[in-house]
């Protein structure tokens, strides 16, 4: 484990950009967990530290859809119009194409520029788009899918999460609506910065507020759970869910494998291969979110806040890496400028920059995966 701790130290401040890092990996029974750093105000990270899962929420979305398939509530080959008239401009798009990112969607007004949930819902229901033979990674399909769940089942996405995951597995730190008043358990993502067109912006990230701006508006500040982001959880709870998913307790292994297969094994974008609302192994060794040695039925979900979750269904193993790569960091740079050793120089001052964090994280991911299959 010494090598893993060394690699974690390379990712965390002062060597790297992360303020804290939690790592857990294993199979159905045994697991190994390591922690490093603080979540804010000097509080050390531990197994119940709560992270903003960001886009990892999409994998929960895909699992809920597979559960609805198992319960004969939905057929993924059906178009949207089979279940609702709300999304009139994309009524003929099939659910499976939304899940596999085989759509190109756009609203007239940005969702994060809407002034209320009501306005955002109007924009989302008026969304325009069409089928795309090549998958295009985007939040928009997940936003539509998240709202569609109610039309299909009569139950909101957030209620599905509570009933399918939180309640049955007694998850104390998997939350979307009732975030604890004791903020000392929740990661602080404050002082995040974006460098856009030569202007340095300081992002407003209140503790316990979802980082994704679309989810903030559409979810009405955690009153509703959106399909693209909004879940918070800990490494302890994700470890429980990893084991439950791999042993077929939440959905069958066949259904989990269907998430990996997605829209077909040839369904590849410009730089990635996709399952249903997740990544799978790709031929591009630099861009792939799944280790090259992983099985065909391995899926990964990644969150902008610094999160990574791998499930290898065939090899019966998982990797969870929960990091905070936003606090006190420049997280977006456009246009690109020189980044040396996770630092950028702007206006005569040096800043931590997490733009290349994923490539550094992948070295840790691959090392752990090699240990798992030894």
Annotated model-derived regions:
Residues 149, 245, 313, 322-325:
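Short beta-strand segments enriched in hydrophobic/aromatic residues
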Residues 2-51, 73, 330-340:
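Short, conserved catalytic-motif segment at the N-terminal edge
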Residues 13-22, 42-98, 128-140, 226-229:
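Short active-site loop at a secondary-structure junction
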Residues 22, 97-99, 309-310, 318-321:
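Structural recognition of the beta-strand scaffold that forms the well-ordered cores
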Residues 247, 260-264, 268, 283, ...:
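Short, gly/Ser/Thr-rich active-site loops of penicillin-recognizing serine hydrolases
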Residues 91-294:
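Short, surface-exposed loop or secondary-structure junction motifs
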Residues 298-299, 305-318:
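Short, surface-exposed beta-strand/loop micro-motifs that present aromatic residues
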Residues 9-13, 50, 220, 293-299, ...:
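Short, P/G- and charge-enriched loop/turn segments at secondary-structure junctions
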């Amino acid at each position: 484990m010494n090598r893993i701790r060394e690699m974690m130290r390379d990712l965390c401040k002062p060597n790297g950009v992360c303020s804290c890092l939690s790592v857990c990996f294993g199979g159905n029974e045994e697991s190994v967990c390591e922690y490093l750093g603080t979540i804010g105000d000097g509080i050390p990270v531990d197994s119940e530290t709560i992270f903003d899962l960001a886009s990892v929420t999409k994998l929960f979305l895909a699992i809920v859809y597979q559960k609805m398939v198992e319960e004969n509530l939905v057929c993924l080959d059906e178009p949207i119009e089979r279940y609702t008239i709300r999304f009139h401009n994309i009524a003929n798009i099939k659910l499976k194409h939304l899940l596999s990112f085989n759509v190109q969607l756009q609203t007239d007004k940005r969702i994060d520029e809407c002034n209320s949930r009501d306005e955002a819902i109007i924009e989302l229901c008026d969304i325009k788009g069409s089928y795309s033979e090549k998958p295009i990674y985007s939040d928009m399909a997940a936003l539509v899918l998240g709202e569609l769940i109610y039309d299909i089942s009569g139950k909101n996405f957030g209620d599905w999460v509570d009933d399918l995951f939180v309640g049955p597995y007694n998850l104390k730190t998997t939350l979307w609506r009732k975030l604890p008043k004791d903020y000392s358990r929740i990661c602080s993502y404050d002082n995040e910065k974006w460098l856009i067109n030569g202007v340095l912006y300081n992002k407003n990230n209140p503790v316990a507020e979802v980082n994704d701006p679309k989810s903030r508006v559409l979810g009405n500040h955690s009153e509703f759970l959106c399909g693209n982001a909004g879940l918070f959880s800990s490494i302890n709870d994700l470890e429980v869910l990893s084991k439950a998913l791999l042993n077929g307790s939440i959905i069958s292994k066949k259904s989990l494998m269907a998430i990996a297969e997605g829209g077909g094994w040839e369904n590849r974008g410009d730089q990635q291969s996709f399952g249903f609302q997740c990544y799978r192994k790709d031929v591009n060794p630099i861009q792939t979110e799944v280790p090259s040695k992983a099985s065909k039925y391995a899926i990964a979900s990644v969150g902008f806040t610094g999160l990574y979750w791998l499930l290898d269904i065939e090899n019966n193993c998982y990797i969870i890496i929960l990091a905070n790569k936003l606090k006190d960091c420049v997280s977006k740079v456009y246009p690109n400028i020189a980044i040396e050793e996770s630092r950028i120089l702007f206006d005569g001052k040096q800043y931590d920059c997490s733009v290349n964090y994923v490539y550094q994280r992948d070295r840790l991911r691959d090392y752990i995966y090699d240990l798992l299959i030894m």
